[in-house]
Regions:
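Helix-loop-helix hairpin linking two adjacent transmembrane segments in secondary transporters
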Residues: 101, 138-185, 234
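Helix-to-loop junctions at the C-terminal end of transmembrane segments
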Residues: 63-74, 262-275
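Intracellular juxtamembrane helix-capping segments at the cytosolic ends
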Residues: 115-127, 316-329
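Juxtamembrane intracellular "pre-TM" segments in multi-pass secondary transporters
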Residues: 2-6, 185-218
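C-terminal transmembrane helical hairpin of 12-TM major facilitator-type secondary transporters
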Residues: 277-321
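Conserved MFS/SLC helix-loop-helix module at the cytosolic interface between two early adjacent transmembrane helices
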Residues: 61-99
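Cytoplasmic helix-loop-helix junction between adjacent transmembrane helices
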Residues: 105-143
Length: 347
């Protein structure tokens, strides 16, 4: 069992969001510089094309095999170690002599970057019950900002300093995140420091079986995430077919995801005051309205309005569902987070 006696100040909550932004950005840096990497390794196109996928596979592996450890290992130490591995992985990417080596460090980057998903349940544990939703929303804003920043900043740095400069920048920012971790995270004590790792993994199945609210929240989120993903799968083809637009316009529309950064803390605060169920209903209504707009308002303006509604709705439901699962089992928040995130990404 864990002793969570510390409370986070608003400044520390904001800093946790910044840490999450930094580490998540490292996952997405490679997506905007693949063409530059391919130029350095013209005979390894196959390996270069695997880099984004392998990074995401590493993230999935980290979600399943590393995040549950936060219920048993002192979280500050675990977060610090993962951040240190992430720093070394970014250095490895910068120095990679071949694309194959780059693929290996991409996997390591994805796995270590799940440190962000160690931080979210930690923030929930250290927040006041009456402000848990707002805290989770603020930290998740950092995660969302990291996704956008990784793609945008990666491309900008790559244009002037090359792809190695991008990964060097990621390493430097990760070093800054490590400094913040050392400064702001309190040490927490565990009353049961010994554990069986296989038993930890087996307990995931028991939690899924015994916690119906977890099943409801995760399955709801998986279905809505699938709805969200469908749009971004077909949007580039629709824009190219109907308007002959390229990737630049798709990227500009993706930047509308900034609305999610603004919605997350608001959704968390609403969940604290009114309960997460109402926030879930509100978010689902927004997403249904978004698809109605896509269907009836077949234009670029309609697409913009629909994207704003869809993104806002998805984030509202996400934060509300996280509020629900983090309120269930204080001793199992990391494992519940593993179930939630893994099932969501399957959707």
């Amino acid at each position: 069992m864990r002793s969570d006696n510390h409370e986070l100040s608003s400044t520390r909550i904001l800093m946790l969001g910044i840490i999450c932004c930094i580490v998540v950005a490292n996952i997405y840096f490679n997506q905007s510089v693949l063409n530059l990497i391919a130029g350095s390794f013209p005979n390894e196109w196959g390996a270069v094309s695997l880099i984004p996928m392998v990074t995401q596979v590493g993230y999935a592996v980290g979600l399943f095999f590393l995040i549950p450890l936060g219920d048993y290992i002192e979280r500050q130490r675990l977060i610090l170690r993962q951040a240190q591995v992430l720093f070394l992985a970014m250095i490895g990417m910068m120095l990679s002599p071949t694309a194959t080596v780059l693929v290996f460090f991409s996997f390591l980057t994805g796995m270590a970057a799940t440190v962000a998903q160690q931080i979210v349940p930690l923030a929930a544990s250290l927040s006041r019950t009456s402000a848990r939703g707002k805290t989770v929303g603020t930290v998740m804003s950092g995660v969302l900002a990291g996704i956008l920043a990784g793609r945008a900043i990666g491309g900008l740095i790559g244009q002037y300093f090359g792809w190695r400069g991008v990964f060097l920048s990621g390493a430097i920012m990760t070093l800054l995140a490590i400094f913040f971790i050392l400064r702001i995270l309190p040490t927490q004590s565990l009353s049961t420091p010994k554990f069986n790792y296989l038993a930890v993994l087996r307990s995931l199945g028991l939690l899924w079986k015994n916690e119906p609210q977890v099943r409801g929240a995760t399955l709801t989120q998986a279905m809505l995430f699938a709805s969200f993903s469908v749009l971004w799968t077909v949007l580039p083809f629709w824009l190219a077919y109907r308007y002959d637009y390229g990737a630049g316009i798709t990227g500009a529309l993706a930047a509308l995801g900034l609305i999610g950064i603004l919605c997350a803390p608001l959704a968390g605060s609403f969940s604290d005051r009114q309960g997460p169920f109402r926030m879930v209903v509100f978010g689902v209504i927004l997403m249904l309205l978004a698809w109605t707009v896509f269907w009836r308002w077949n234009s670029i303006v309609g697409m913009v309005v629909g994207i704003l509604l869809l993104d806002a709705g998805e984030q509202c439901v996400l934060i509300a569902n996280q509020h629900t699962i983090y309120s269930l089992r204080p001793d199992a928040r990391n494992r519940l987070n593993t179930l939630f995130m893994c099932v969501m990404f399957i959707g």
